[in-house]
UniProtKB/Swiss-Prot annotation:
Official protein name in the record: Ribosome maturation factor RimP
Gene that produces this protein: rimP
UniProt-annotated stretches for the region Disordered: 183-203
GO term, biological process aspect, one: ribosomal small subunit assembly
Family: Belongs to the RimP family.
Organism: Ruegeria sp. (strain TM1040)
Subcellular location: Cytoplasm
Classification lineage: Bacteria, Pseudomonadati, Pseudomonadota, Alphaproteobacteria, Rhodobacterales
Pfam families in UniProt: DUF150_C, RimP_N
Record's GO cellular component terms: cytosol
Length: 203
């Protein structure tokens, strides 16, 4: 089931319904999707492997498969650019399991409504308990652990720290991946008619 952290707007949720099966059939998971309007409409997709470690070739495969599916479904009226990327080091946390996976690392959480007079919480993730995200925060000079229901969250992401960078590099080295270009985005041009891989804008 898609939550607001993965897809916020109605169009994002509609797109998530279309592309999630495509991404999962390839062995990946959807982390976040956003249709961004502006001078150029951009469909931003973040994806990952279940155990992490998505690479440029993976993003290209996802991009090609998603483009082919959007050719048929045609959910976007205007010309658009499709961007598929890894979540990055200071990644957004969009699934309950993310908070368990990154236990011990610093994160920023934001809730939709005020919780005890505040919406923003920053501290060390302490795992999950049922449907709650646990986080250690500083309060009156002491470290306390609080629980926030996952459904309360409107935004969540890791904080870029030396420890996090070292861990990500360690994982990449252990996986035999040393090419830092693997964090780059894969971009293809697309349109409501589904042209992909073109450098020209399509309408």
């Amino acid at each position: 089931m898609t939550n607001d952290l993965i897809a916020k707007a109605a169009i994002d949720r509609r797109l998530a319904e279309i592309i999630t099966p495509v991404i999962e059939d390839l062995g990946y998971e959807l982390v976040r999707i956003r249709l961004m309007s502006g001078k150029t409409t951009t469909l931003q997709i973040m994806a990952d492997r279940p155990d992490g470690g998505i690479e440029v070739d993976d993003c290209a495969a996802i991009s090609n498969a998603v483009s082919a599916t959007l050719d048929v479904e045609d959910p976007i009226l205007d010309a658009y650019t499709l961007e598929v990327s890894s979540p990055g080091i200071d990644r957004p946390l969009t699934r309950l399991k993310d908070f368990d996976m990154f236990e011990g690392y610093e994160a920023k959480l934001e809730t939709a409504d005020l919780i005890d007079g505040r919406r923003r919480f920053k501290g060390e993730l302490a795992g999950i308990e049922d449907d709650e995200v646990l986080i250690n925060i500083e309060e009156h000079g002491e470290t306390v652990t609080i629980g926030l229901k996952f459904d309360w969250l409107s935004d969540a992401k890791l904080v870029l720290t030396d420890d996090l960078i070292k861990e990500m590099l360690r994982q990449r080295k252990a996986a035999g991946v040393l090419n830092e270009d693997a964090f780059d985005d894969i971009e293809t041009e697309g349109s409501a008619e589904g042209t992909t891989g073109s450098e020209e804008e399509n309408k």
